[in-house]
Amino acid sequence: MLDRVKLALLITGNDFDSELTDLIDAAAKDLGIAGVDALVISTDTNDALIIRAIITYCGYQFEIMHGSLDRSAAYKKSYDEQKAQLSMTTGYTTWTAQT
């Protein structure tokens, strides 16, 4: 996942690896708090929606510290939408259907 995040954020070298690894873990926990199933959000997932959400979260947080607040706001808006969609989608949550 670290390599995917670095590629998406156009980060080369290893200077930010520790910080990005922390952000990846934080993204997974944030999705879990929103109700996304922990089995779905493992950081070795191949699920495109989870990967995109984690990358977007990392972009939003990384831009706050090292980039543009405008870009950070755009990433945050996108991440919040992705998180909301995932937290309401069958197959991504632990919620069961009520009859």
Regions found by a protein language model. Name each.
Residues M1-I50, S87-T99:
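Conserved short "hinge" loops at termini or chain/domain junctions
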Residues L49-I51, I55-T99:
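Short loop/turn elements at secondary-structure junctions
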